[in-house]
Structures are given as structure tokens and as C-alpha cells.
Curated annotation (Swiss-Prot):
PANTHER family: 33 KDA CHAPERONIN. Its main location: cytoplasm. Under oxidizing conditions two disulfide bonds are formed involving the reactive cysteines. Under reducing conditions zinc is bound to the reactive cysteines and the protein is inactive. InterPro entries: Heat_shock_Hsp33 (IPR000397), Heat_shock_Hsp33_C (IPR016154), Heat_shock_Hsp33_N (IPR016153). GO terms for biological process: protein refolding. This is 33 kDa chaperonin. Belongs to the HSP33 family. Disulfide bonds join C236-C238, C269-C272. It is found in: Cytoplasm. It holds the Pfam family HSP33. Keywords: Chaperone, Cytoplasm, Disulfide bond, Redox-active center, Zinc.
Amino acid sequence: MTDYLVRAIAKSGSVRALVCVTTATVGEICKRHDTLPTATAALGRGITAGALMGSLVKTGQRVALRFEGNGPLKKIVIEADANGSVRGYVGDPKVHLLRPDGALDVNNALGRAGFLTVAKDLGLKEPYRGTVQLYTSGIAEDLALYLVESEQIPSAVGIAEFIEQDGTVAAVGGFLIQAVPPVDPLVVEELMTRIEQLPPLSELLHEGGNPEQILEQLLAGIPYDILEKRNIAFACSCSRERIERVLLSMGKKELSSMKKDQHGSEVTCEFCGERYLFDEADLDRIIAEIAKQES
């Protein structure tokens, strides 16, 4: 089934909500990185967070999330855009930690101490950046803290996954609810109560709940309009041409040394695992191009 996100706003204009299912996208990305179950859960949460944040920027803009902790997973890096494209990776895909009750321990895998940095490429000279300390290292709570502290928007975020014992991605999804200025404290209180009473999100997802059905439960009793429905999918912007531009920037001396010592160059994209091979003839051509630019 195609992953997608719905965006809605209360008819009163006081609340906006985003709900998405990312199961297929997470499955594809985790397969590319050959992740173990806990790393799969962590990456799945990050991808979902990225999809939610990507829907808040305008066409042509991008957002990057970087969760860095002191645990064995080390980091979760996600990039997403306004079109629903998302990509990501973790520092160590082979991390697999369990809590005493047998649940996947994403929090300690990432590490309790660390930071979340959000960078938005809004088409300006420099991207906008905001950083907060990790709150729980569970991803959803950390993103909510960022939105409240850095963007000053009262927000509630829920992200959940259902990973089978064999590591298969059975269901992943999430929601983001925000109070729209001027903020009504009573509306915020009502929403928080409603979220607390919601059945476990992982159960709703595993039972086949789609974004519209989850949205209906989140905003039960609150009249709302669905503004948009957009597909979410893995997409990587890497290409041989981009890698070649990086090699061009390295200079003749380093490329000549690479040719002599390694007889070529192999570059692997961290986001998708695609391998790009440049043999000695390729390096000679790039070195010649540098010489031409310098003359």
C-alpha cells in the first residue's frame, strides 16, 4: 500500500493536524541499510518525524533532522522535502537493544544525552538551524520539545512502529498536532487529554488504521477539514554527477595520490547505499578538468 500523509485544520482555525503512515518507506530504507530490529525502529521513527516536518515546508524547500546521542546507535540522520520524499540512515545499523520487558529499546540505543538539530533549507543564503537537547531520546518527544522551544509552537507528536520478531516492518506512522496562534489554553488542554485517551498508536497502525481513521480519533468531536493528501516515498538525490563534483573540489594533488595508491575511487552514499566507482581513467579526466579550470 502507498504511504501517505493527510493535513487537516479545525474549522475554528485553532488546531492543525498531520497524520501519516510510512510503513513501506521505512521498510525500503531499512532494507537498504540491513538494520537490526532496534535500529529499524529508531530509523523508522526518524523517517516518520522527517515526513511530518517535510510537510510543514513549502515546495522546493527541505528539512534535515539530526538526532545525536551517546548510545551505540550514535545518530539518526533524516532529510525530507515538501513533496513527500524522505531518506535517512543511522550511525550503526547493527544495534539491537531490548528493555527488560523485551520491547525494543530505542531510547538507550540512541543514548539519553545528546542533541536534536533541525536545519531548514528555505532557499535563503544560509539554512535556518535550531538545536535542543534530547528529552527522552524516543524521537517523538524530542521533536515536540524542539517545536515548542525553538519554534514557539505548542505541539504534540506521536510516532509508533510495530516490528515483527524477525525484523519485518509491519507498521509505522505518526501524527503532529499544533495549536494555531493565538493559542487558546483550553484547546491545548483538551487536545492533550484526547491524546492521552487515544488507544496505543502502534495498535491502531498494526490493525490497519489509515491516516484518515487516526485523524478521526485524534480530533473526535472537533469539526475539521482535510486540506491535503500527499504520498510519502523514499527518494535519494545522490548521483554520479554530484559525486564527481565532490571529487573535482578535492584538487589535483589528492586525486593524483588517490589514483596512485588506490587505482581509483569508490564512494558509497550514506543515505541509500548506492556505490559509485571511478577508475583511473575517470580520475585522469577529472584531473584534466581541474587543470583546464585553473588555466
